[in-house]
Amino acid sequence: MTSDPIADMLTRVRNAIQARHPKVDVPASKLKAEIARILKEEGYITNFKVAEEGAKKTIKIYLKYANNNSPVISAIERVSRPGCRVYVGQTDIPRVLGGMGINILTTPRGVMTGRDAHKEHLGGEILCRVW
């Protein structure tokens, strides 16, 4: 068992992209499924499915590549860690690459992008950023 399951998920995605794999399997949780949903909505992955294999649930994340086989996700990194949580208010949500990337936050109303949290006047914990 890992001490930071979100970082484990992001590392698996990063490694699969570098190896040019079409999909990657990660152990499932509700929070990871919400992160995958946001990545799909923002166009960073093709699709994801929560699959039950026996007693264990896994999330199959189908990665997205451009026409020249370059990955759509240039970088994906963890911001708030178990040892150093990062919380921001609505006015303090940072921009990623001048608006070209996204922050994924967990707020009192659920997991959403930094842009959506700002529109709804919400702050929260920055889970990761993607560009």
Swiss-Prot record:
It comes from the Bacteria. One of its GO terms (cellular component) is ribosome. One of its GO terms (biological process) is translation. The keyword Ribonucleoprotein applies. GO terms for molecular function: rRNA binding; structural constituent of ribosome. Disulfide bonds: none annotated. It holds the Pfam family Ribosomal_S8. Keywords: Ribonucleoprotein, Ribosomal protein, RNA-binding, rRNA-binding. InterPro entries: Ribosomal_uS8, Ribosomal_uS8_CS, Ribosomal_uS8_sf. SUPFAM superfamilies: Ribosomal protein S8. PANTHER family: 40S RIBOSOMAL PROTEIN S15A. Belongs to the universal ribosomal protein uS8 family. NCBIfam families: PRK00136.1 (NF001109). One of the primary rRNA binding proteins, it binds directly to 16S rRNA central domain where it helps coordinate assembly of the platform of the 30S subunit. HAMAP family: Ribosomal_uS8_B. Part of the 30S ribosomal subunit. Contacts proteins S5 and S12. This is Small ribosomal subunit protein uS8. It comes from Solibacter usitatus (strain Ellin6076).
